[in-house]
From Swiss-Prot:
Residues covalently joined to lipid (N-palmitoyl cysteine): 35
Domain of life: Bacteria
Lipidation (S-diacylglycerol cysteine): 35
UniProt membrane topology term: Lipid-anchor
Function: May be involved in the stabilization of the cell envelope or may interact with the sensor protein CseC to modulate its activity, in response to cell envelope stress.
Protein name: Lipoprotein CseA
Source organism of the structure: Streptomyces avermitilis (strain ATCC 31267 / DSM 46492 / JCM 5070 / NBRC 14893 / NCIMB 12804 / NRRL 8165 / MA-4680)
Organism classification: Bacteria, Bacillati, Actinomycetota, Actinomycetes, Kitasatosporales
GO cellular component assignments: plasma membrane
Length: 217
């Protein structure tokens, strides 16, 4: 994933979601197969006539999941005093009333409602210029995380906050950053704490217009 703005990050998130969905369907298929095969499964363990008893049994109650509320992310960012002035100035519609904002809902802080991750990008090349996490507090939302060093993009991954930042040296083209950091945060004691950090150095000899300069002897 190099110099592709948020497109590669979105693709990575979509791939993870697809893998999780396929795995879930596989487990469901195995469960149905186990119950439907003659001579096997829990239905054969009871006495004769137990099928009619099972049919009349009460259906187990499933705990309702937290349904995400639809939030006006643009207004949330513009009204937030913690958001930098440069990000607010850049947050303008690209086409008609379509803003360059990605919004994700999920459980990051263990609250009663889903948390909201907002990524603000540029219109032309979809480079992330600001990432924020909002936690519901009563009837409003509190900014509990922000990162405003572009290019930056935040995602929810298995209950943790994952922030990707690409870094450029002088004269680096936009499509070829010199390095990238992926930082994982977890929620503890009412704040996000860094759990791990992965740093990747990219080769200047690949994809660039100039050849790599050999190191001096």
């Amino acid at each position: 994933m190099r110099g592709l703005g948020t497109e590669s990050l979105r693709a990575r998130g979509a791939l993870k979601a697809a893998i999780a969905a396929v795995a879930g369907l596989a487990v469901l298929g195995l469960s149905v197969s186990a119950c439907g095969t003659g001579g096997t499964g829990a239905r054969d363990e009871g006495p004769a006539g137990s099928d009619s008893v099972a049919a009349g049994a009460a259906t187990p109650t499933v705990s309702p999941s937290k349904a995400p509320k639809s939030v006006d992310a643009v207004k949330l960012v513009k009204d937030d005093p913690k958001v930098g002035a440069a990000v607010k100035r850049a947050l303008k519609p690209c086409v008609a009333d379509e803003y360059p904002v990605d919004v994700s809902y999920g459980d990051l802080t263990g609250g009663s409602a889903d948390d909201i991750v907002v990524n603000v990008m540029t219109c032309g090349d979809a480079v992330g210029i600001g990432s924020y996490v909002y936690r519901e507090q009563g009837h409003s939302y509190e900014n509990v995380f922000r990162a405003e060093e572009p290019p930056v993009y935040a995602e929810i991954d298995r209950g943790e906050l994952v922030v990707t930042q690409q870094m450029y040296e002088k004269d680096d083209p936009v499509s070829y950053p010199s390095s990238e950091e992926v930082i994982t945060y977890s929620w503890s004691a009412n704040r996000f704490s860094e759990e791990s950090r992965t740093h990747t150095e990219y080769s200047n000899a690949v994809g660039g217009t100039d050849s790599a300069t050999p190191a001096p002897n």
